[in-house]
Design a protein with these regions (language model features):
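Short, surface-exposed loop/helix-turn segments at secondary-structure junctions
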Residues: 93, 235, 300-302, 306, ...
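Short helix-loop capping/hinge segments that flank enzyme active sites or metal/cofactor-binding pockets
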Residues: 67-89, 246-255, 305-359, 409-419
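An N-terminal boundary/leader segment
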Residues: 1-56, 281, 451-457, 599
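Short glycine/serine-rich loop segments
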Residues: 99-100, 104-225, 401-424
Length: 599
């Protein structure tokens, strides 16, 4: 395998800033595809000439864009205009006119889409072999299954063919392939990523997911893709705050000794115990909890009424041409026959009751930590029993979307037998950034190479989490570094965290005063304003009141939304004060305004 340029985001940024062209990366991608020599990874590989043209069209390197020139692939149940979507069923195939919302977001950010990947048909399975096109091979061990349903997307990342990929996740399809191929799998809060242009499996439970070689890369791709899509009736507005270091102390819940399941795999049990010990050493407070209610919820996904949702998604084939479907897939979805509306409501009630039992417990932790899978499944075992091993792989994944939780799967140190180690962190909806930060703690302790490559990952240098004794404040003018009023922060013990920008929801003014002009930040219609440059400072709580006294009207402190949708305290201006002010929203940067003023 070629190892010239590791395809982590950080390595690509370094390469591009040093003069490497996106065309060189495209050539490397296609060379890797040839070397891996697994024709079952892709269901639609785009022509290299087309990608070279797209790479050339990117122009000059844009250092401010984390996805500029980053290669990726998507699961073939996600639409790309003019390219067939099959969901791994030839008779279902169609050619969409529009590209899925999430894919558009990534391409607009400069990412290069290489192709569409193989999957368990109609995203029904956790094994990756339920496809009439031939199954992709596990990137690390040919004996074990690649994991599904997002098999091709997981394997492509593990081989270092691309930097990241999109899968989908209903029962664990964005996590099991990650566990089996030594990569990261991020399953976001439901509704955070648009499902427009995605073939549904269980529409009420589906989410697009992200595979990457590192936690930081997975979260960065997720942050770019995440945006509210009014065309998706299941979309929700979520915050995607910048990834920061995990707190020095955090609470983790794990399955109790009486409820944890390893299917007799002592090596897997030892691997998980080592990870728990490492978490304890890094500041985690570990508490065991009974997972029995979660297992009951997990079993309901395929054995309860939710299988009828899969029937709805495939009804035209199931009723008109059932022989067109993969036999095991047809059998699973066909089990919906006989399910009644009464069964559905009984299922809803039971899940709600169990969720009510578990919610108070889950809420006491920063995250749950589970073995990503109880044990491994070989291709031979699956051939002998197409159903049992698949169900086992969903032990720690199937309940997550039914409870509207978020999750991230992360590699740990390799097991004693050489197979990949992996754990998954799970938390309440909206805690995606928190569990990603915790996952970096485990990632830093792993000595494994990335995926199936020989690449090593540097531990990310993440900004600190704001401590409980400080207030984070956004400043946009004379209080910034190097300006006259910065001393009012520094003399109170404030610390500069980083430069950032607001969400594009603000107007920016130079307010007329008797002396020098002052900045005025005013909120306007969402998405109709400017993204204004700010600095973020942490100021001690006991000094904040004194700082507030230094702020004259028409300025004040209020809530300011940053470009990642996180919210901090910050300077705002009364709208009436802008009537005679100069609108400098086009500059959107006080430093640029002052430089222009003195030029």
């Amino acid at each position: 395998m070629l190892d010239e340029i590791p395809l982590t985001f950080a390595s690509l940024r370094q390469a591009y800033s040093g003069g490497t062209s996106p065309a060189q990366i495209v050539r490397q991608v296609y060379a890797r595809i040839e070397q891996v020599a697994d024709p079952n990874i892709f269901l639609c590989l785009f022509p290299k000439e087309d990608l070279l043209a797209e790479a050339a069209a990117l122009g000059t390197y844009d250092a401010a864009n984390p996805l500029w020139g980053v290669p990726f692939v998507i699961k073939d149940n996600i639409d790309v205009a003019g390219k067939p979507t099959t969901a791994a069923c030839p008779e279902f195939a169609y050619v969409p006119e529009d590209t899925a919302f999430v894919v558009q977001r990534l391409q607009e950010a400069g990412a290069l889409l290489i192709g569409k990947t193989n999957l368990d048909q109609f995203a029904t399975g956790l094994v990756g072999v339920r496809t009439p096109y031939g199954a992709p091979k596990n990137a690390l061990d040919l004996e074990i299954v690649p994991g599904g349903s997002s098999a091709g997307s997981g394997v492509a990342v593990a081989h270092g063919i691309v930097s990241f990929s999109l899968g989908t996740d209903t029962a664990g399809s964005g996590r099991v392939p990650a566990a089996l191929n030594n990569i990261v799998g991020l399953k976001p809060t439901l509704g955070a990523l648009s499902a427009s242009g995605v073939v549904p499996a269980c529409r009420t439970l589906d989410t697009v997911s992200v595979f990457a070689l590192t936690v930081e890369d997975a979260y960065q791709a997720y942050s770019v893709a995440a945006a509210y899509d009014p065309a998706d009736s299941y979309a929700r507005r979520v915050s995607t705050p910048a990834l920061v270091a995990a707190p020095t102390k955090f609470k983790i819940g794990i399955p109790s000794a009486n409820s944890i399941r390893f299917e007799g795999d002592e090596v897997q049990a030892a691997s998980f115990a080592e990870t728990v010990d490492a978490l304890t050493s890094s500041g985690a407070e570990i508490t065991e909890i009974d997972f029995a209610p979660l297992y009951e919820i997990a079993e309901m996904l395929y054995f309860g009424p939710w299988v009828a949702e899969r029937f709805v998604a495939t009804e035209s084939l199931m009723t008109g041409n059932p022989d067109a479907m993969f036999p095991v897939t047809r059998k699973i979805i066909g089990s919906a026959e006989g399910k009644t509306a009464a069964d559905t409501f009984k299922g809803f009630y039971r899940v709600k009751d169990l969720a009510g039992t578990m919610a108070p417990t889950i809420s006491t932790f920063d995250a749950l930590c589970v073995p990503s899978i109880p044990t491994f499944t070989t291709v031979a075992e699956l051939e002998a029993d197409p159903m049992g091993p698949n169900n086992m792989l969903g032990t720690y994944t199937n309940f997550v979307n039914l409870l509207n939780l978020c999750a991230i799967t992360v590699p740990t140190a390799a097991r004693s037998d050489g197979r990949p180690g992996s754990v998954t962190f799970i938390a309440e909806a909206g805690a995606d950034a928190k569990i990603a930060a915790i996952a970096t703690r485990v990632e830093a302790l792993s000595s494994s190479s990335l995926g199936a490559t020989r690449w090593r990952s540097a531990v990310p240098s993440l900004p600190d989490t704001p401590s409980a004794d400080v207030i984070r404040i956004a400043v946009c003018g004379a209080h910034m570094s190097g300006f006259p009023l910065n001393h009012t922060l520094t003399e109170r013990g404030a610390r500069l965290v980083r430069s950032d920008r607001t969400a594009p929801d603000y107007k920016f003014y130079a307010l007329p005063t008797n002396g020098a002009a002052r900045p005025g930040l005013v909120r306007t219609t969402r998405g109709k304003g400017a993204s204004v440059a700010v600095e973020l400072w942490d100021i001690p709580i006991d000094a904040f009141g004194g700082f507030m006294k230094t702020i004259p009207a028409p300025l004040g402190i209020g809530k300011v939304t940053l470009r990642d949708e996180s919210v901090v305290q910050g300077f705002l201006c009364e709208a009436i004060a802008t009537q005679d002010a100069e609108d400098i929203s086009e500059l959107a940067d006080w430093r640029k305004y002052k430089a222009k003023e003195t030029a």
